[in-house]
Amino acid sequence: MKERTIQPVNNGLNGNITIPGDKSISHRAVMFGAIAEGTTTIKGFLPGADCLSTISCFKEMGVDIVQNGDEVTVVGKGLEGLQEPKAVLDVGNSGTTIRLMSGILANTPFFSCVQGDASIAKRPMKRVTNPLKQMGANIDGREEGTFTPLTIRGGDLKAIEYTSPVASAQVKSAILLAGLRAEGVTAVTEPHISRDHTERMLEAFGVKVTREGKTVKLAGGQKLTATDVQVPGDVSSAAFFLVAGAIIPNSKLVLENVGMNPTRTGIIDVLEKMGATFTVEPINEGASEPAANITIETSSLKGIEIGGDIIPRLIDEIPVIALAATQAEGITVIKDAHELKVKETNRIDTVVAELTKLGARIEATDDGMIIYGKSALKGNTVNSYGDHRIGMMLAIAGCIAEGKTIIEDAEAVGVSYPTFFEELQKLAK
């Protein structure tokens, strides 16, 4: 376990930063390119551990993929061209890979076995395997397909109209991807609208997708046609520097090419409501995935209540929002965030435990947390528990803590932001 020592940042964070490619879009670009007809070129790809796991799995199924830094070429096999893997498909730490790929494997007439690391082994798969089984896929795993490893024997599927108990883009996407080769029209209805990268990208690859309120539909039998994909910066990665810019004294940051998909910009809405000083300059209006340059500077924040429909739009940003709340005047309440319990760690528990070690006044609730601002943080030894977003949040916390902060298991940040610590160091000079 590698550790990192973070010293207080006395002169603020200043400068321009180009945010690495969006993880969600990078995964999908590789997967959709693999099952499309023709060659897909991806620019702005995120070469983090999770997305490299996706490349590795599809190579194992006979897809020709060449990756050179943030540029990837995928020679598509079409929906029916994937080959039965000779080895176990290892997704590493990537929940997106295992859940979306399960949808593709469910409609493919061969046998596969899918597993990941210790964190993946604890994450619930039944939310995906149950609807796929209803469509006709043969799936098994520990505790009747609840946990990995999963075995999948795909084949002829029938479309379903599925009402998901959770607002999850991974669940929705798995069902829609299975539906590409299912007989009939597949429909997924969610309690709240989740991120819509799958729908946008399927349309870019030539698939007709219908959206009606909280329901998404597609007809089986549609082919994907290769296209070039430009991946914007990941707003979830940008969130750490947005909060850093707001809470570290004497800071002014310009974040370039940040993805502004409206199903992902809850963090922007929350910072605005908390009183942060920032500007958003759109740079590619009309694109399938909008992007902007964001300038943010040190701000006086106030506590707010966060819950309801906005939660799926910022679920991954809650750890760093909690940190921002420790520096806000008043109380911040985060609720309706049960999904935090089934992330890389139980993020309710880890956020509360680690911020408490730094002197924050924060308490866990069943579906979120309550943060009492404003807290003066003090350096301590903390742990990411292998969770990239916890690791990065703690690094930003260390920048405003008195004395040094030691982060154990700091290399976890490489899952989504391999250059995070280098960028942080550069901006602090």
From Swiss-Prot:
Residues the entry annotates as binding 3-phosphoshikimate: 23-24, 28, 168, 170, 316, 343
Primary location recorded for the protein, binned into one broad class: cytoplasm
Enzyme Commission code: 2.5.1.19
Pfam families: EPSP_synthase
InterPro entries per the UniProt record, alphabetical: Enolpyruvate_Tfrase_dom, Enolpyruvate_Tfrase_sf, EPSP_synthase, EPSP_synthase_CS, RNA3'P_cycl/enolpyr_Trfase_a/b
PANTHER family noted in UniProt: AROM/DEHYDROQUINATE SYNTHASE, PENTAFUNCTIONAL AROM POLYPEPTIDE
NCBIfam families in the record: aroA (TIGR01356)
The family this protein is said to belong to: Belongs to the EPSP synthase family.
Name under which the protein is recorded: 3-phosphoshikimate 1-carboxyvinyltransferase
